[in-house]
Amino acid sequence: MEPGRGGTETVGKFEFSRKDLIGHGAFAVVFKGRHREKHDLEVAVKCINKKNLAKSQTLLGKEIKILKELKHENIVALYDFQEMANSVYLVMEYCNGGDLADYLHAMRTLSEDTIRLFLQQIAGAMRLLHSKGIIHRDLKPQNILLSNPAGRRANPNSIRVKIADFGFARYLQSNMMAATLCGSPMYMAPEVIMSQHYDGKADLWSIGTIVYQCLTGKAPFQASSPQDLRLFYEKNKTLVPTIPRETSAPLRQLLLALLQRNHKDRMDFDEFFHHPFLDASPSVRKSPPVPVPSYPSSGSGSSSSSSSTSHLASPPSLGEMQQLQKTLASPADTAGFLHSSRDSGGSKDSSCDTDDFVMVPAQFPGDLVAEAPSAKPPPDSLMCSGSSLVASAGLESHGRTPSPSPPCSSSPSPSGRAGPFSSSRCGASVPIPVPTQVQNYQRIERNLQSPTQFQTPRSSAIRRSGSTSPLGFARASPSPPAHAEHGGVLARKMSLGGGRPYTPSPQVGTIPERPGWSGTPSPQGAEMRGGRSPRPGSSAPEHSPRTSGLGCRLHSAPNLSDLHVVRPKLPKPPTDPLGAVFSPPQASPPQPSHGLQSCRNLRGSPKLPDFLQRNPLPPILGSPTKAVPSFDFPKTPSSQNLLALLARQGVVMTPPRNRTLPDLSEVGPFHGQPLGPGLRPGEDPKGPFGRSFSTSRLTDLLLKAAFGTQAPDPGSTESLQEKPMEIAPSAGFGGSLHPGARAGGTSSPSPVVFTVGSPPSGSTPPQGPRTRMFSAGPTGSASSSARHLVPGPCSEAPAPELPAPGHGCSFADPITANLEGAVTFEAPDLPEETLMEQEHTEILRGLRFTLLFVQHVLEIAALKGSASEAAGGPEYQLQESVVADQISLLSREWGFAEQLVLYLKVAELLSSGLQSAIDQIRAGKLCLSSTVKQVVRRLNELYKASVVSCQGLSLRLQRFFLDKQRLLDRIHSITAERLIFSHAVQMVQSAALDEMFQHREGCVPRYHKALLLLEGLQHMLSDQADIENVTKCKLCIERRLSALLTGICA
């Protein structure tokens, strides 16, 4: 690069000025430049700092040479490349339309025709990339640029989509990539964000998320942080996106095929390139494409702007409104993840993070696209969500041409009639007549009461409620999918124009009703149609009219941070003591209501399992409520264990294997979660540390001492689960039986209080707000004493005494645990390990397991030390004088000798782990992230402490070795392996005894700790017989834990 004239800099045949900055990222800045001779050829010059690139500079140069040969109209052209001393300059094609992210921010959603136009161009570019074996790995709306040859107001037909920034992400350092990709993990494939092996199908997942966002306005799966999204993917083996009901069948099938969690089940590139959705069928009548939005220079958020009326869609007639109901009738089911948006007075630019509700108006009858008569309506649901007074079409006669009214105003307009345009992106509207149309509105209301309304479809309109606040209303009743006469599906339309953000009122989710309707919603959502008799017990007349209104698609992507908002609307168990907190006051008998009908229970969606449908997924820990509503929502505790949800729903889940390697943040108690393949110490038989030679074979006497008659033999498959130990009823995950329950009489079972959830880091008991409580008793009424929190299984101390809960089964729901304030959230830092390479993750997992195993061995050494101190007491001195042959076993020196052996083994393991970490860091396989530094620092501290302990014990044992020479021959029988195995056996014995006597507060953590000790011991042993014995013990413990988990979930 050479400095040019007038402050310009030169890169080859191009020049640019650093004043013309058009964009910047974490590692690069982009300037606008031009050709030095052809001044009308505008370019974008991207400057990348070399410090942000990996060491493989030659590979980057080769890749750039390949990219220079990529000539495609839908790929940003790379004109030139120059490498300087400190920077790399890329001269690329300039796109004047911005990127797709800005386009979606302005448009919110796109029509299927526009999506098809864009997707056809993306597929064309991907076809070329796939043929050359190039994986983008970072497809997102920010990397899809738009180019308009005729300017920014060009029609979507003339927009050229171009893919940019491919081939460079792989050359960024891993920790750097974690910083620059903090905004795009929700577009990354699950196998990429979980640091697993991936192939080109990862780009297909990203394309699916982009198409989904174009359709609904948001990504299909969201979380408050990349780490939460990674945990969500790890917990859910099957993912089903919520697709709007009015989506066409080809697009629906395309999204479901692209958004498959398992890359093996995902469609391949050939299927994608030849998908029916990409082929524009001439027989299908398409809706007009969405025009490009204007980019105002000033932040004009006025709701009365009339400049957007040229982009608005045509209104539906009253007859089409009825047709829309017949076609799209559905209750509000799992799509109703309502989320409070910002104040309606804010500008449209300030509402980009809120959930938007997009109007789907029906067009003229000729524009309706009907599917096959036998086609069933899509299983997704619609909910009519309200906006402020957007005038509804059809309130006037045919011969009158209504004038447009201010879109989405917060009060009725004093002048002008009901507007024909649905200019709000907020949602459906409540028709409130302006003063000049009161008589027409009254006439329509009278027509609604007449029995001839089904012969005059244009006389039907939505009955407005008595409130002028923004309202949302759900469909009155669903249309059964088996009715083929109502199977026509509307082509997806959208309404455009400026408008204020949607602000829901407390009545969101309710429906307006007319006189004569019963205030009690039908449990099956039965629909009253003309000519059909109503259901038994219904107070509606035989020809009760159906609610007429515009169907509005609710943007219902399962936002993991918003689920708690809708939970007050879910049906509560009859015995829930908190069930009346959110339920409206009940009238004595159900009477006809002239206001709003109470919210209908949400119906299960066929796309999610039933147990998840009865209660939505728990909110992700620390997830924010993106907007502050006018009323406060309760805080939710951070117990996010899905097993709590399963236990509440009565679903039995038997994990195939129990976890033996928790994360570093979970060192201490264990909670019975199954060990996934990504959490295992490794399949390498050598394990995280090398085996040592067994000084003696582990005898079967220890097995028999541990399991009694249940000691496993080579041909036996019996376990603790099948033995008399089973007489103890299962309590829970580390269930803490409070003293009040233990003191109960024998005539009835004692109520059991147990906790479910993930504890905080460390060995301290979890805080109160982090505990989810369940209280179970035999029979009777509910009690509110179950809301008291007790320490979880982290501490061995008994739980504090609580008032005995009343008989009955009561569940303290997390949503009601804290009602005093609004949800607050501080954005967490992005963990560096989120997007590290697989090799780095495996090495770090081995170091973590070594640290955890060593800590448990140190606990054994501490116990030996305490026993040695106790052996110096007068009681032990008396025993030594009486039982002379047991002096070696009861003396303090013997305990010191055992401690010394354990500390030596710990020092050996830590030294091996530290040396391995150093070698891996030097080899470049292990990155120096903050977590790695923390683990290595802790390993080093423990190593130094172990060496100091060995030196001190060696000095203490000098007299032991001098005075008791006859015991030197027995010193060889002291091995760290035998001590660890004996301690694990003792833990299993004590846990089994406590479980038999129904003292279960520490059984599950002890089982887990013993299982982890045996797991580490298995990596240390070299004798095959010893390894087989340890494996049998592990199987017995795992079966017992599985039985406990099964009993808890049941």
From Swiss-Prot:
Phosphoserine occurs at S317, S403, S450, S467, S469, S477, S479, S522, S556, S638, S639, S758, S775
Catalytic activity of the protein: L-seryl-[protein] + ATP = O-phospho-L-seryl-[protein] + ADP + H(+); L-threonyl-[protein] + ATP = O-phospho-L-threonyl-[protein] + ADP + H(+)
Residue numbers carrying Phosphothreonine? T456, T575, T636
Task: Report the InterPro entries cross-referenced here.
Answer: Atg1-like (IPR045269), ATG1-like_MIT2 (IPR048941), Atg1-like_tMIT (IPR022708), Kinase-like_dom_sf (IPR011009), Prot_kinase_dom (IPR000719), Protein_kinase_ATP_BS (IPR017441), Ser/Thr_kin_STPK_Ulk-1/2 (IPR016237), Ser/Thr_kinase_AS (IPR008271)
Enzyme Commission (EC) number = 2.7.11.1
Could you say which residues bind ATP here? I22, G23, H24, G25, A26, F27, A28, V29, V30, K46
Effect upon mutating V290M: In an ovarian mucinous carcinoma sample; somatic mutation
One Gene Ontology cellular component term attached to this UniProt record is: endoplasmic reticulum membrane
Q: Name one GO molecular function term.
A: GTPase binding
The main place the protein resides is cytoplasm
Q: Where is the Protein kinase domain?
A: 16-278
Residues covered by region (Interaction with GABARAP and GABARAPL2):
287-416
Q: Which residues carry this modification: N6-acetyllysine?
A: K162, K607
Annotated spans, C-terminal domain: 828-1050
Pfam families with a match to the protein in the record? ATG1-like_MIT1 (PF12063), ATG1-like_MIT2 (PF21127), Pkinase (PF00069)
Give tissue specificity per the record.
Ubiquitously expressed. Detected in the following adult tissues: skeletal muscle, heart, pancreas, brain, placenta, liver, kidney, and lung.
After translation, the protein is modified as follows: Autophosphorylated. Phosphorylated under nutrient-rich conditions; dephosphorylated during starvation or following treatment with rapamycin. Under nutrient sufficiency, phosphorylated by MTOR/mTOR, disrupting the interaction with AMPK and preventing activation of ULK1. In response to nutrient limitation, phosphorylated and activated by AMPK, leading to activate autophagy.
Q: Where is the composition biased (Polar residues)?
A: 436-459
**Role this protein plays:** Serine/threonine-protein kinase involved in autophagy in response to starvation. Acts upstream of phosphatidylinositol 3-kinase PIK3C3 to regulate the formation of autophagophores, the precursors of autophagosomes. Part of regulatory feedback loops in autophagy: acts both as a downstream effector and negative regulator of mammalian target of rapamycin complex 1 (mTORC1) via interaction with RPTOR. Activated via phosphorylation by AMPK and also acts as a regulator of AMPK by mediating phosphorylation of AMPK subunits PRKAA1, PRKAB2 and PRKAG1, leading to negatively regulate AMPK activity.
Q: How does it assemble?
A: Interacts with GABARAP and GABARAPL2. Interacts (via C-terminus) with ATG13. Part of a complex consisting of ATG13, ATG101, ULK1 and RB1CC1. Associates with the mammalian target of rapamycin complex 1 (mTORC1) through an interaction with RPTOR; the association depends on nutrient conditions and is reduced during starvation. Interacts with FEZ1; SCOC interferes with FEZ1-binding. Interacts with TBC1D14. Interacts (phosphorylated form) with TRIM5. When phosphorylated at Ser-317, interacts with MEFV and BECN1 simultaneously. Interacts with TRIM21 and IRF3, in the presence of TRIM21.
The protein's name in its UniProt record: Serine/threonine-protein kinase ULK1
Native species: Homo sapiens (Human)
Could you read off the lineage of the organism from its UniProt record? Eukaryota, Metazoa, Chordata, Craniata, Vertebrata
